[in-house]
Each structure stands twice: as structure tokens, then as C-alpha cells.
Regions:
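Active-site-proximal alpha-helix that buttresses catalytic centers in soluble enzyme cores
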Residues: 1-100, 104, 159, 219
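A generic secondary-structure signal
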Residues: 62-69, 164-172
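Acidic, low-complexity terminal tails and accessory targeting/binding regions
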Residues: 7-19, 30, 98, 110-129, ...
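GST-like fold's C-terminal all-alpha helical module
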Residues: 158, 166-171, 178-184
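Beta-strand elements within well-structured catalytic alpha/beta cores of enzymes
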Residues: 1, 78, 176-188, 192
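Histidine-centered active-site/metal-ligand motif
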Residues: 3, 84, 185, 245-251
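Short glycine/proline- and acidic residue-enriched helix-loop micro-motifs
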Residues: 41-51, 132-156
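Conserved beta-strand termini and adjacent loop/short-helix elements that scaffold enzyme active sites
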Residues: 1, 105-107, 239-241
Length: 268
């Protein structure tokens, strides 16, 4: 699934003006978090690693509730190291009522060219644990955190990193080992479809730079795709709209199926 609504999409450089006279965070809109605790990080660190809005949390809660009532509560939870993805994964999984530990997979992080100025300063595992997030210390990720941004990454390298990370996660969840939730980015949802759909068995579908432009429109906040592994042949079956969509006035988290189900990377 894609993460929920992010603060900077609505409020721009919120971290620069949401301050009180002491330089501490101050809520200036009711869709902003009342406070940023229990995380204790400088506001400037949110510049390239933003948080969820209040409604972003609500969207994640709705998806988690849908997983619960549809019998798809996760047994394992993976997420990108971006804070908004960590928050989304934690909130959605909490709503299902099952115990869980977050497995942070740096290989799921979005394309580097969205960060031309500098690498985001991610919240560390120690900071997350201190803030109450239940992190799986025993998880060995496909991609190490220090390897992110270590080299310039082409679009082909980006596709391979994310799809290989998804395959790594799938390999850890053998048939009969339960349901997996992956919370990451809009492009991750698209790359998951291109990796696991049966029509791409011989060669995964690539997501092109053209596809990545404005991908947040066809893959909106908290949208998701669901695949089920067939026990007889170990292949994946796509379940269209396995979870009910979320619709409110001019917003819906429903995927643009013409985009997500396109046959090749060239189609928009």
C-alpha cells in the first residue's frame, strides 16, 4: 500500500513556520498533528522526511480496519524507512488488533531523483524504539540503510532495487506463513504489480521515468494492490479491489486501473 496523506503535500515547508517562540513545533491547522511527540527530532529533519497529517493517520486506520474485517490482517509488516511509511504501517497494523513488529526495508525507498539536494535524514531504529514503535531487531534487510544514496541510481537500478526487495520479502513469506503488509510509496505499488502479476512472469514490467511523473495521481494515498500465492504452483494471483475503497467528496484512494494494469511500461 501507499502511505497516507503527507504534511508537505498540503502545507509545503510546514517545518519552517510551524514554530512557537521557543522554536518548538506548533500546530497551525487541525489537519496537522497536535504535536510530534514522542519523536524528538529537529524540525529541519522533516524537510526530506515528512510526517503524516491527521487525515493521513485516519486513512491508514481505515485500511487497517478493512484488512481486519476482510480476514486479511497481516502476520508480517514491512515498510520503507520514510517516516510517513513507518507511521502508515504501524497505524494500519495496529487497527487489526494483531501483535506485530515493523520490519524496515531500505530497499523499498522511492527513487533518488526526488531528492536532488541531499539524502533524507531518516529516523534511526533506536529513536523509533524509544518513541514506542515496535521494531523487529532480528530482521536482516535486503538493502542496508548505508547503501541508500551511496551511488547515483539509474531508473533501471531503481526498478531492480525495489522489485528485488519485494521478491526478498516474498521469499521470506513461504506458502502457509500468513499475510504480509508492505507500506511504502506510490511507485512501490506500481512496481509490485509489475513484479507479481502473472502476465509478467518472464520479465517484470518496468516503471519508466514517464510513469513516475505524477504517479501520485493514479496511485493515490493509501491505495493498494493485493496478491495471493497459489499453493499448487507457487505463482501469484492478483485480487482486484480486495479491500473496499475509501471515498470522501473529491477524494478516493481507488487506483486508476488503466494505469496500474497496463501491459507494458510505455503505456501511461
Amino acid at each position: 500500500m501507499r502511505h497516507g496523506e503527507r504534511l508537505d503535500d498540503l502545507f509545503g515547508e510546514w517545518y519552517s513556520y510551524c514554530k512557537n517562540k521557543n522554536g518548538k513545533y506548533r500546530q497551525r491547522d487541525l489537519n496537522m498533528p497536535p504535536d510530534l511527540s514522542p519523536l524528538n527530532r529537529p524540525l529541519g529533519e522533516y524537510q526530506n522526511d515528512t510526517a503524516l497529517t491527521v487525515l493521513g493517520h485516519v486513512l491508514a486506520q481505515m485500511v487497517g480496519r478493512a484488512m481486519l474485517v476482510s480476514g486479511r490482517s497481516p502476520d508480517m509488516v514491512y515498510c520503507s524507512p520514510a517516516l510517513r511509511c513507518i507511521q502508515t504501517a504501524s497505524v494500519a497494523a495496529t487497527m487489526t488488533g494483531r501483535p506485530f513488529k515493523l520490519r524496515i526495508e531500505p530497499g523499498l525507498f522511492e527513487n533518488f531523483d526526488l531528492y536532488p539536494d541531499k539524502k533524507p535524514k531518516f529516523v534511526t531504529v533506536e529513536e523509533l524504539k524509544h518513541s514506542g514503535f515496535n521494531i523487529d531487531d532480528d530482521y536482516t534487510p535486503y538493502c542496508k540503510m548505508e547503501d541508500l544514496f551511496a551511488v547515483s541510481e539509474s531508473n533501471e537500478m531503481y526498478n531492480d532495487r525495489v522489485q528485488s526487495s519485494l521478491q526478498y520479502i516474498a521469499n521470506k513469506s513461504a506458502p502457509g506463513r500468513g499475510t504480509v503488509l508492505v507500506a511504502a510509496h506510490a511507485s512501490t505499488v506500481d512496481l509490485a504489480f509489475g513484479k507479481f502479476h502473472s502476465r509478467f512472469l518472464k520479465e517484470p514490467r518496468q516503471t519508466t521515468p514517464e510513469n513516475l511523473m505524477n504517479i501520485s495521481i493514479p496511485v493515490p494515498y493509501s491505495s493498494n494492490v493485493t496478491f495471493m500465492r497459489n499453493s499448487d504452483d507457487d505463482q501469484w494471483q492478483y485480487i482486484r479491489e480486495a479491500l473496499p475503497p475509501i471515498t470522501y467528496r473529491n477524494f478516493s484512494n481507488r487506483l486508476n486501473h488503466d494505469f496500474i494494469e497496463r501491459c507494458n511500461a510505455a503505456q501511461q
